[in-house]
Amino acid sequence: MWLPVLGLVLGIAIGLMTNLTIPSEYSNYLSLAVLAALDTLIGGIRAHLQGTYDEMVFVSGFFFNIILAISLAFLGVHLGVDLYLAGIFAFGVRLFQNIAVIRRNLLTKWTLSKKNKKNVI
């Protein structure tokens, strides 16, 4: 569980400390890469809460998602079609699905802990 959080903290820190500007022709690639990274991070948190987290799956999924997203955007540029929008849609849907599962999981655990406290008292 510490690997996703460490990556997020390091990424935010490096992004805030550097004055790096991205050219506009790379904005589609960057948006997909950020969404792919967030999807992988949220998926890792979901897997941890469900007890199925595996670092190898997390790291390989991270790189596979980024490579797939960038390849899709690259192909779309050469075909003259905005294929990056398909990646944005897919990662966005998965992101919200994972967040919904995390929310349900946390609410279930919270409700069970409240019931257990009432039964003890």
From Swiss-Prot:
The primary location reported for this protein is membrane
**Gene Ontology CC terms:** plasma membrane
- Keyword annotations for this protein? Cell membrane, Membrane, Transmembrane, Transmembrane helix
> Which cysteines link up through disulfide bonds?
none
List, alphabetically, the Pfam families matched: DUF1290
Q: Which residues cross the membrane?
A: 2-22, 29-49, 57-77
Q: Does the keyword Cell membrane apply?
A: yes
Where does this protein reside within or beyond the cell? Cell membrane
How does this protein sit in the membrane? Answer: Multi-pass membrane protein
User: Key word Zinc present in the record?
Assistant: no
Question: Mind telling me which InterPro entries this protein's record contains?
Answer: DUF1290
Q: Which family does it belong to?
A: Belongs to the sbp family.
Name listed for the protein in its UniProt record: Small basic protein
Per the UniProt record, the lineage of the source organism begins with: Bacteria, Bacillati, Bacillota, Bacilli, Bacillales
